[in-house]
Amino acid sequence: MYKINYHMHTTFSPDAENTPEEMVLASADAKIDEICFTDHFECNGNSSIPEGFTPWPEFQLDKYYAAISSLKDSPICVKVGIELGQVTQNKPLAEKVLASYPWDFVLGSLHNLSNQYDFYYIGLQGVDMRPLMRDYFEQLYELAVYNRFSVLSHLYYPVKYIYRQGRAFDLH
């Protein structure tokens, strides 16, 4: 079996702790044949992070691409990708990022609704889940129609936080 992982974040993303080099070595140790780094690039900037929380640093696109590209001669196959979040909230920026480099793989993600915080930060007690999820799937559909990525990721992203907060939700 050929083992791959195409959704990996490094220290270029604020939600990860390992360098690209460390992740290549760990992947090789785990007998993974091929990986693709897809660090976060949020097209809506820090607008989805509430005041009082640490804002994400500006993504260093050139530095990121150079660092990952330098690993192409690793003991395993290494691809250069990116996770574009909230593409439809800033299509001109998304287009600029997509045109910047010959990406091997692009994830399209939706971590927050337009003019809302990332679901990670939202308190959902007392919130009616049906309209929230309807809005989410409508915006996810808009992202799917945009169709400038390899894979649409996190299809049920809000559900993770709904359950984490002890709420139940039936998608049917």
Regions found by a protein language model. Give the residues of each.
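Alpha-helical protein-protein interaction elements
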Residues: 29, 56, 93-97, 128, ...
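Short, charged beta->alpha transition segments
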Residues: 67-68, 93-96, 138-143
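Glycine-rich anion/phosphate-binding loops
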Residues: 15-22, 89-94, 130-138
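Domain-core and long-helix interface of multi-subunit machines
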Residues: 14, 100-101, 107-172
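Short aromatic-enriched loop/helix-cap "lid" or pocket-rim segments at secondary-structure transitions
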Residues: 48-49, 93-94, 119-120
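An N-terminally biased module of ancient metal coordination in phosphate/nucleic-acid-related enzymes
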Residues: 1-88, 98-100, 159-171
